[in-house]
A protein has these predicted regions:
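Cell-wall polysaccharide-cleaving catalytic domain and substrate-binding groove, primarily
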Residues: 1-84, 89-157
Length: 157
């Protein structure tokens, strides 16, 4: 994760004009973030980052480095033209990702720490799977560094 900075974009590629204009994702609507992400990906493609599967491009934004911001917001029932991509919204969206990974099942004891951990690693590229590797390692963009297994075991106790 990005250290909980709610207004950042992925730092591998920089679009100087965006930073010069003073954009801050936390003050933008979901639609504006989606448009910026799309423009950002297209800009990277124009620079020659053009793999067939797009693994060499990213427009991850916010504290949790989210990609499918608009799709997630819509599935959560947000009005994407009015909802800001601020701390409150990002935290709610992170909860959504936790639940996609099985948080409620883990909390109820229906899945193991390892199963939950590995599902989280799919949602959050910074988290290592129980095997020690990230679900997205080797994609040219990500490298997992966080081992949360000890934390999950501690929370379970």
């Amino acid at each position: 994760m990005s250290g909980y900075i709610y207004c950042i974009t992925n730092s591998k590629y920089k679009i100087d004009d965006i930073y010069k204009l003073g954009y801050t994702a936390a003050k933008m609507t979901i639609d504006e973030v989606h448009d910026l992400q799309t423009d950002y990906l297209n800009h990277q493609k124009a620079l020659g980052y053009d793999s067939a599967d797009g693994h060499d491009r990213s427009a991850a934004m916010g504290a949790y480095q989210m990609m499918e911001v608009k799709a997630v917001a819509q599935s959560m029932g947000f009005d994407t033209s009015k909802t800001l991509f601020n701390k409150e919204t990002q935290d709610k969206m992170a909860d959504y990702y936790l639940n996609i990974a099985g948080y409620q099942q883990w909390k109820a004891g229906k899945i193991s720490d390892q199963q939950f951990n590995d599902a989280l690693a799919i949602q959050f590229a910074s988290i290592k799977k129980a095997s020690g590797k990230g679900a997205h390692d080797g994609d040219g963009m990500n490298n997992a560094y966080g081992n949360i297994m000890p934390l999950l075991k501690q929370l379970r106790e």
